[in-house]
């Protein structure tokens, strides 16, 4: 069972997004940052180009691997994808909550059958680049972002997920509705006065931790810094 959030060291709650497009760039970042952070996230850009070897790079560093490929397909296909992700050493995996509880349950069952019931399976709710207007256009509804996030969080729990990926702006409502044991991974983290880039719903590290985030995902504020290791240490300090 995962440690409760208060017991987790701040560095173990910081996930650095390897938002680069080559093994060489990822290798340099992992070498610089692995003494200071507990996790690295590999997304679709890096994985599509470099594949399994970049996962091995993270695992060989001693860090934990968040494979963020956001599976969304028929249950049998998703189950197979999860089995393959686990074979690569994934410690955390994303799936889209909108795939529904049957798809999500297939993922959980695949993990259990592989002897990896400990893997953190998190369902994506509403992507953090969407504001309310765009979200409603996508879903064909008229509702608040928070309401949609909560509905998808309930789908995630029904499907056996460990938790969800959600903005810290909706995080307190998720914790109230789902309980503190329901893990929330929060992307869209920016430092004060930084550009939002392509994110619409962003918060600082302090705001995310105060709101109850179990993990925060940070990309550009670390990997684009002049000194990524110093930037990571600074964010860890802000989380404490």
Roles of regions detected by a PLM:
Residues 88-101, 190-192, 198-231:
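Glycine-rich phosphate-binding active-site loops on the catalytic face of alpha/beta enzymes
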Residues 35, 61, 88, 159, ...:
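Structural motif
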Residues 15, 38-41, 66, 94, ...:
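Conserved beta-strand positions in the central sheet of alpha/beta enzyme cores
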Residues 8-12, 73, 77-162, 167-170, ...:
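Conserved anion-binding
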Residues 52, 65, 167-217:
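A C-terminal functional module that forms or caps the active site or interfaces directly
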Residues 16, 40, 70, 93, ...:
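Conserved, mostly hydrophobic/aromatic
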Residues 1-29, 59, 171-172, 176-179, ...:
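N-terminal amphipathic alpha-helix/helix-capping segment at the start of soluble metabolic enzymes
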Residues 104-110, 114, 209, 222-240:
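C-terminal helical cap(s) of enzyme catalytic domains, especially alpha/beta-barrels
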């Amino acid at each position: 069972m995962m440690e409760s959030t208060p017991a987790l060291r701040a560095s173990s709650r910081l996930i650095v997004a390897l938002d680069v497009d080559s093994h060489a760039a990822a290798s340099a970042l992992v070498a610089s940052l692995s003494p200071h952070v507990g996790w690295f996230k590999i997304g679709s850009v890096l994985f599509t180009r470099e594949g399994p070897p970049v996962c091995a790079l993270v695992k060989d560093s001693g860090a934990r691997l968040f494979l963020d490929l956001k599976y969304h397909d028929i249950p049998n296909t998703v189950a197979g994808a999860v089995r393959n992700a686990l074979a690569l050493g994934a410690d955390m995996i994303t799936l889209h909550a909108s795939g529904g509880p049957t798809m999500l349950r297939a993922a959980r069952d695949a993990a259990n059958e592989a002897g990896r019931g400990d893997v953190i399976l998190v369902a994506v709710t509403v992507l953090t680049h969407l504001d309310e207007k765009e979200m409603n256009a996508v879903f064909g509804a008229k509702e608040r972002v928070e309401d949609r996030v909560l509905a998808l969080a309930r789908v995630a729990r029904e499907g056996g997920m460990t938790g969800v990926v959600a903005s810290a702006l909706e995080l307190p409502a998720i914790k109230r509705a789902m309980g503190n044991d329901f893990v929330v991974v929060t992307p869209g983290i920016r430092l004060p006065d930084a550009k939002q880039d392509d994110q619409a719903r962003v918060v600082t590290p302090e705001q995310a931790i105060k709101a109850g985030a179990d993990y925060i995902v940070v990309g550009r504020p670390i990997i684009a810094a002049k000194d990524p290791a110093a930037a990571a240490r600074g964010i860890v300090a802000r989380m404490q």
